[in-house]
Design a protein with these regions (language model features):
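Cross-family detector of peptidyl-prolyl cis-trans isomerase
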Residues: 2-158
Length: 158
């Protein structure tokens, strides 16, 4: 009886290992497929649009309205508009945010969900933000473009 129980447990164990390995291979395949769609710009910014939006393309001068979560490469969250229950808005191209935000958001449209990987030189550089973001840290932003306010010909927001 003990031998049958041990044999059954051994078979179950081997089956579990095989199932876990197949799951891991599937996940790796998904990651490979999704990261192959990532684009790296000449400046070093990498972006991946995980869900395509159907709204207008963002452009310099627009006020981009978005939700985001900012992460360090170790996975630690340092900021999130979701935590404040308030989307973040900024004028694209005005230099009021880190360079990687200006460059990355200009690649997106309303409704896009994207991941931006922003090298330190396009983020907070060698100074970082003490006790929050280390010097020259690469930052990861998970973004959802919620809306845009475009300037009209008169220069006033529409």
């Amino acid at each position: 009886m003990k031998a049958k129980l041990i044999l059954a447990l051994l078979c179950l164990f081997l089956f579990s290992i095989h199932a876990l390995d197949a799951t891991a291979q599937t996940r790796r395949g998904r990651v490979r497929r999704s990261t192959s769609a990532a684009i790296t710009t000449p400046s070093g910014l990498t972006y991946l649009i995980s869900k395509k939006g159907t709204g207008p393309q963002l452009k310099a001068g627009d006020t981009a309205i978005m939700h985001y979560t900012g992460l360090l490469t170790n996975g630690m969250k340092f900021d999130s508009s979701y935590d404040r229950n308030q989307p973040f808005a900024f004028k694209l191209g005005a230099g009021k945010v880190i360079k990687g935000f200006d460059e990355g958001l200009a690649k997106l449209r309303v409704g896009d969900h994207a991941i931006l990987v922003i090298p330190g030189k396009l983020a907070y550089g060698p100074k970082g933000i003490p006790n929050v973001i280390p010097p020259d840290a690469t930052l990861i932003f998970v973004i959802e473009v919620v809306d845009v306010k475009s300037e009209t010909v008169t220069g006033r927001p529409s």
